[in-house]
């Protein structure tokens, strides 16, 4: 397991972050590749022959090997410059092998494609690659790779001459590879940014300490009087001590000076050292500012969430105290803020909002589809309906004893409990009475949303709960787009209400069809739904009766007296409702005369005790229902006449109209089976009606 983890860790350095599981070779999906506007983004992935992609994992591995050699060079160059004379020993052989690797890299660079800074496309023409390299870093790479230590042996002076030792310091040019590596790792999402920055700052600090110590020792070593140096004043025979002891002493002086500790035991003894120490301390001023600034930025960024959280808590506490809010509301406010802070990393709503809708829909479908599918309200609906619905779902966390829904609150959302538990309470007198409980997988708030009624319960959490919220607008759009699924939802709600003892249904033959038709605001045949969405003062209910029952003005008056039976007929027709923004808000009637307004009340408590609405209708603007055509027959012993007419609003009007057509006085209406009809609601379009003559006329 440890070997596999180590292999995967080092693989991150060699493979681009977007190519880990997709392409093995010559992959171009890189964070550095960004085609310009209008350019082709599907650039061919096949380069010219003998041209290497800079994003090839094998080339990335080669670069990582060179970075390791650069780290070695960064340490050995100042160390050899100050402490070691050039000799044909093992260190001499290692240095030349390292130089050989960098010489190979110089040749290899002529065959590596580069990223054009203007088009952000790879350039694989050998001529352009060569011109670009020769005009930029070629000379510096050659100077940093030249074996000056070996060349010094060809001259009469030995390899310890200061001139060749200075030229060997050109190998520090290779450090640009380390800088490029850190710049790439800081943008790589697979590596922690904080620890990447800390590693970079620590590396820079150690390199500065190492170089300063080596340079300080070199000045003391080259001074004509060893006892008049910063190290000779303490160790007169320091040149006779081991290299390790001298190197540790130099590091000790360097770190105490860099950290401005300055114990005073090691200090400058001659003007040459004093001048170097002055410049080194000036360098320390800028370098310390760089370190402190970067570390402060990292720490502040790390603790900014906590600081913002404490500021929010303090502001909420001051607001509650200033407005003298009750203790229970204060507790809910603080609990909600604390829970939001703890679950901020789980939601990341801002990050999701920045993604394209297709990606957000895929995430929501993966997270919420199985949960919504098991809710009783959506049993039997199509997958397309659920997919459209889950795309607009929001997940929220609620602490214990927090109100999710308030009793008599305007219905705005439907909730699904994912984890935790909630209680349904009703405020009676001066105390709350628990009417029920919801467990994981239950939905609540559906009665208010689907029945256009204020919420019948207060829903309060009893423990830490995760709840999915579906807005009324999203549910409305989905049900309009899938009418059959909307009918299934209403049937599921109806069966749930019939099965609950606390929500009794007196009429078992009632159907939820009329509720569905009332809920579908602004149907497909009309554009009235847009008026409501745009803030206009009208709301239209498209209520289509499956039996096309006619309704006259007399029934509007009768509906106010006869309760549910007549109200059902009223609701099953197309009407125009003048009201405010909220469905359960009464229209104030301003601007209309008393003669224009007919007020009535939907009393559907017998079937749905929580589905009620007080709405005022502007009668003269009410849409006319579809007229029913019926055939009336004169039924007598010696005559059989028939006429096709428009069905009037009542049986009395029908008998009067038949009397005008046939010239007789009629008393009864029957159908083809000789069954007497005393209610016009049972008459359908196209029926044949038989009129009985009053024998006394």
From Swiss-Prot:
Q: Which residues lie on this side of the membrane: Cytoplasmic?
A: 1-63, 113-134, 187-200, 294-697
Q: Which Gene3D superfamilies match?
A: 1.10.287.70, Helix hairpin bin (1.10.287.630), Jelly Rolls (2.60.120.10)
The family annotation for this protein states: Belongs to the potassium channel family. Plant (TC 1.A.1.4) subfamily.
Q: Where does a nucleoside 3',5'-cyclic phosphate bind?
A: 377-496
Q: Which residues lie within the membrane without crossing it?
A: 249-268
Q: Which sites carry carbohydrate?
A: 158
Question: GO CC terms on record?
Answer: monoatomic ion channel complex
- Positions on the Extracellular side per record topology: 85-91, 156-165, 222-248, 269-272
Q: What does this protein do?
A: Highly selective inward-rectifying potassium channel. This voltage-dependent channel could mediate long-term potassium influx into guard cells leading to stomatal opening. Assuming opened or closed conformations in response to the voltage difference across the membrane, the channel is activated by hyperpolarization. The channel activity is enhanced upon external acidification.
Give UniProt keywords alphabetically.
Answer: Glycoprotein, Ion channel, Ion transport, Membrane, Potassium, Potassium channel, Potassium transport, Transmembrane, Transmembrane helix, Transport, Voltage-gated channel
Instruction: List residues of the KHA domain.
Output: 629-697
The reply to whether Transferase figures as a keyword in the UniProt entry is no
TM region(s), chain numbering:
64-84, 92-112, 135-155, 166-186, 201-221, 273-293
Q: How does it assemble?
A: The potassium channel is probably composed of a homo- or heterotetrameric complex of pore-forming subunits. May interact with KAT1. Interacts with SLAC1.
Q: What GO MF annotations does this protein's record show? A: voltage-gated potassium channel activity
Against Pfam families, the record matches this protein to: cNMP_binding, Ion_trans, KHA
Q: Where in the cell is it found?
A: Membrane
Q: Which SMART domains does UniProt cross-reference here? A: cNMP (SM00100)
Q: How does it sit in the membrane?
A: Multi-pass membrane protein
> Origin organism of this chain?
Arabidopsis thaliana (Mouse-ear cress)
Tissue note: Expressed in guard cells of hypocotyls, stems leaves and petioles. Detected also in the phloem of minor veins and in flower at a lower level.
Q: Which domain of life is it from?
A: Eukaryota
Q: Which SUPFAM superfamilies match?
A: cAMP-binding domain-like, Voltage-gated potassium channels
> What are its GO biological-process terms?
circadian rhythm; response to high light intensity; stomatal movement
What does the domain comment read? The segment S4 is probably the voltage-sensor and is characterized by a series of positively charged amino acids. The pore-forming region H5 is enclosed by the transmembrane segments S5 and S6 in the Shaker-type (1P/6TM) and contains the GYGD signature motif which seems to be involved in potassium selectivity.
Report what the protein is called.
Potassium channel KAT2
């Amino acid at each position: 397991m440890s070997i596999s983890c180590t292999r995967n860790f080092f693989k991150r350095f060699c493979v681009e972050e977007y190519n880990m599981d997709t392409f093995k070779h010559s992959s171009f999906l890189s964070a550095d590749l960004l085609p310009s506007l209008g350019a082709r983004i599907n650039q061919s992935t096949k380069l010219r022959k003998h041209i290497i992609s800079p994003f090839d994992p094998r080339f990335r591995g080669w670069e990582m090997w060179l970075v390791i050699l650069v780290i070695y060079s960064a340490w050995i160059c100042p160390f050899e410059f100050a402490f070691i004379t050039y000799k044909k020993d093992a260190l001499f052989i290692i240095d030349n092998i390292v130089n050989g690797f960098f010489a190979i890299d110089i040749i290899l660079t002529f065959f590596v494609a580069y990223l054009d800074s203007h088009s952000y496309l790879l350039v694989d023409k050998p001529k352009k690659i060569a011109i670009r390299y020769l005009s930029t870093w070629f000379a510096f790479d050659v100077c940093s790779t030249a074996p000056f230590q070996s060349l010094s042996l060809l001259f009469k002076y030995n390899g310890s001459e200061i001139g060749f030792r200075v030229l060997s310091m050109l190998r520090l040019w290779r450090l640009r590879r380390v800088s490029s590596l850190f710049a790439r790792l800081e943008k790589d999402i697979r590596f922690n940014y904080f620890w990447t920055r800390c590693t970079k700052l620590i590396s820079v600090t150690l390199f500065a300490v190492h170089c300063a110590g080596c340079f300080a020792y070199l000045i003391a070593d080259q001074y004509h009087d060893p006892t008049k140096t910063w190290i000779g004043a303490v160790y007169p025979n320091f040149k006779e001590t081991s290299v390790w002891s001298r190197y540790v002493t130099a590091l000790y002086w360097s770190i105490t000076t860099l950290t401005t500790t300055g114990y005073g035991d090691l200090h400058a003894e001659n003007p040459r050292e004093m001048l170097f120490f002055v410049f080194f301390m000036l360098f320390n001023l800028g370098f310390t500012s760089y370190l402190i600034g970067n570390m402060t930025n990292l720490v502040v960024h790390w603790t900014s969430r906590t600081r913002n959280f404490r500021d929010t808590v303090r502001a909420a506490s001051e607001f509650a105290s200033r407005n003298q809010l009750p203790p229970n509301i204060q507790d809910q406010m603080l609990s909600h803020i604390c829970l939001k802070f703890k679950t901020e990393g789980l939601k990341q709503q801002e990050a999701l909002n920045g993604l394209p809708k297709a990606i957000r829909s895929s995430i929501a479908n993966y997270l919420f589809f199985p949960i919504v599918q098991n809710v009783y309200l959506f049993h039997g609906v199509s997958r397309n309906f659920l997919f459209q619905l889950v795309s607009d779902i929001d997940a929220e966390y609620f602490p214990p004893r927090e109100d999710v829904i308030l009793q008599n609150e305007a219905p705005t959302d439907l909730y699904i409990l994912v984890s935790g538990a909630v209680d349904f309470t009703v405020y009676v007198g001066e105390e709350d009475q628990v009417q029920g409980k919801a467990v994981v997988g239950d939905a609540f708030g559906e009665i208010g949303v689907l029945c256009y009624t204020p919420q019948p319960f207060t829903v309060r959490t009893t423990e830490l709960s995760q709840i999915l919220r579906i807005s009324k607008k999203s549910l409305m759009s989905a049900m309009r787009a899938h009418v059959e699924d909307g009918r299934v939802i209403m049937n599921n709600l109806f069966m749930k209400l019939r099965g609950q003892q606390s929500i009794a249904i007196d009429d078992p033959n009632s159907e939820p069809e009329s509720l569905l038709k009332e809920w579908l605001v602004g149907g497909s045949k009309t554009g009235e739904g847009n008026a409501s969405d745009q803030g206009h003062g009208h709301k239209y209910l498209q209520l289509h009766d499956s039996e096309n029952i006619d309704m006259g003005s007399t029934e509007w008056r009768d509906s106010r007296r006869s309760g549910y039976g007549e109200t059902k007929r009223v609701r099953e027709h197309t009407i125009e409702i003048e009201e405010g923004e909220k469905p359960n808000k009464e229209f104030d009637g301003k601007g209309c005369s008393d003669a224009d307004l007919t007020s009535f009340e939907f009393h559907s408590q017998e079937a749905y005790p929580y589905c009620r609405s007080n709405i005022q209708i502007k009668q003269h603007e009410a849409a006319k229902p579809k007229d029913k055509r019926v055939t009336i027959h004169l039924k007598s012993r010696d005559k059989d006449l028939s006429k096709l007419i428009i069905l009037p609003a009542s049986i009395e009007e029908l008998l009067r109209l038949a009397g005008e057509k046939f010239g007789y006085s009629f008393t009864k209406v029957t159908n083809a089976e000789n069954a007497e009809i005393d209610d016009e609601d049972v008459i359908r379009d196209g029926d044949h009606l038989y009129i009985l003559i009053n024998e006394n006329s």
